[in-house]
Amino acid sequence: MVYLITGKAGAGKTHYAEALAKELQEEGYQVRMLDGDTFRKKTKNKDYTDKGRIANLNKAARQAREWERAGYMIICSFVSPRKKWRNMMRSFWKESLLIYIPGGTLWKDTTYEKPTEDELNLTHKINI
């Protein structure tokens, strides 16, 4: 299972990802995490154009697929502002759940397409 946590910068994606990882580990699951900021640093991808973002998300999705095949629960936390990019990522995985975190901020000249059919929409009223 791959959990894709999405939302604007500063919305709390990493916080929720870490809390979810802790809960899953306490239930006995082996968990792997991919965080957008950490992944970008690791891959040294400084290209924030659409092409660069797609390449980064594609690499992350492929890494998550390998871990999913190995039996891990995967938690990915990425801004992924375009619906088609999120769908591209999810197409790599056997089973996934989209988690949208509202709030946060966005870079100038960047539009965030909110999930229209999100499977789980977390709000400030949920305590993890």
Label each residue range with its predicted role.
Residues 2:
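Walker A (P-loop) ATP-phosphate-binding motif of ABC ATPase nucleotide-binding domains
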Residues 5:
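Hydrophobic anchor at the beta1->P-loop junction of P-loop NTPases
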Residues 8-9:
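The conserved Walker
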Residues 13:
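Conserved lysine of the Walker
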Residues 16-65, 69:
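Conserved substrate/cofactor phosphate-moiety recognition/catalytic segment
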Residues 84-101:
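Short, electropositive alpha-helical surface patch
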Residues 101-128:
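Small-molecule kinase domains that catalyze NTP-dependent phosphoryl transfer to phosphate-bearing small molecules
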